[in-house]
Amino acid sequence: MSRVVWCARSERGSGSVLAVAIIGATVSIAVALCLVLAAHAANTRAQVAADAAALAAADTASGRIPGDACGRAAAIAAEHGVTLNGCDAGRTETFVTVSLDFGWITLTASSRAGLPDSVP
């Protein structure tokens, strides 16, 4: 009988250790999820900026807006807080690549825009 009492006494306080472990795991998962969601938001931001820059460059290349197509794409990219890495502006189609620094990684996004008949 004393043996059963001794085992029960040796586990006293283990519930609080288990609770701390569960809370720690939950906080770790929440922090990791926040980082993943922030990276996804930054990637979406880069893609939106690439799309806007490509559309602006396509409008400029088609002659609807006066000026340099890649210069216009760089200006739009800068307004969105990203860096223009590449711009290939033709009369009917424009390709744009932008990058965004997110902590220790660099996110890149590409976009293509052009006249309705030229882009499938």
Predicted features along the sequence, with ranges:
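Low-complexity, S/T/G/P-rich flexible repeat/linker segments used as non-globular hinges
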Residues: 2-3, 104-120
